Amino acid sequence: MQQQQHPAPGAEFVADRDAARAEVERALGGYSFRDGGALLLEDALTHSVHPRDEAGGRARHQRLEFLGDAALGLAFATIFYRDDPGLDQGDLTVLRSANVSTQKLARVAVRRRLYPLLRRYNCAPQDHEVSRFTKSVEGPYSGDPIEGPRVLADIVEAIVGAVYLDSKLDLEVLQKVAKLLCEPIITKKALLEDPESMLNELGGEHREDLEIKILAWRKVANVVDDGREQAITTSGLGNGSEDEVGKLRTIRIEEA
């Protein structure tokens, strides 16, 4: 007798679409889609290679991804601009990018259990990749981050795109949903108080940029690199070239 194959952890499929909608609305902090919005949400939760593609499903899903990507950037740009007047343009750019990065959004999808809600077809290798990443996110930090599958970030972006359309492009609703969905938010305060946890949210993506910002916010730090102490200021590492910024991933940082 052939042994039944069980879905990999984190890759189970939720066939009940009403249950899938309820799960998404919970992840969105109780946001409720309008009657027509249910169709938008189903497009967001249908993989671009699903057989429904012949009805234009692929194009609709990808258009929602595109819109959601831009909408998330707008949401976080306005949130940081409004909530922290002390942030300059560089700070705003780095914080926005960190909160909408592929790695950050992939972790959001895992924590909100969004992948099992995705309608997909013949995606066993992808399921395995998602399962492996899910275990790395939910387990203890190993020090060797696994890159988040792009499909996870795509789901988050498509859902946000659906919300933005369903809300009639309401920026206030968009900001609220983005903050609730993407917790924990990477902020200046959080980076200064718990930099390790916040940087782990990103894997390797944008990590160097944020390390530089942390040091700039602290004004001056001592950096030990091969026994040579150098000052770090808002202009970068010592008097060296911008290429030296890459060293920040492998040096030990000690606050002055």
From Swiss-Prot:
GO terms for biological process: siRNA processing. One of its GO terms (molecular function) is metal ion binding. Gene3D superfamilies: Ribonuclease III domain (1.10.1520.10). Keywords: Endonuclease, Hydrolase, Magnesium, Manganese, Metal-binding, Nuclease, RNA-binding. It holds the Pfam family Ribonuclease_3. One of its GO terms (cellular component) is nucleus. The keyword Nuclease applies. It is an enzyme of class 3 (hydrolase). Residues 22-168 form the RNase III domain. Mg(2+) binds at E65, D154, E157. SMART domains: RIBOc. InterPro entries: RNase_III_dom, RNase_III_sf. Its cofactor is Mg(2+); Mn(2+). Its EC number is 3.1.26.-. It comes from the Eukaryota. Cleaves double-stranded RNA (dsRNA). PANTHER family: DICER-RELATED, RIBONUCLEASE 3-LIKE PROTEIN 2-RELATED. This is Ribonuclease 3-like protein 1.
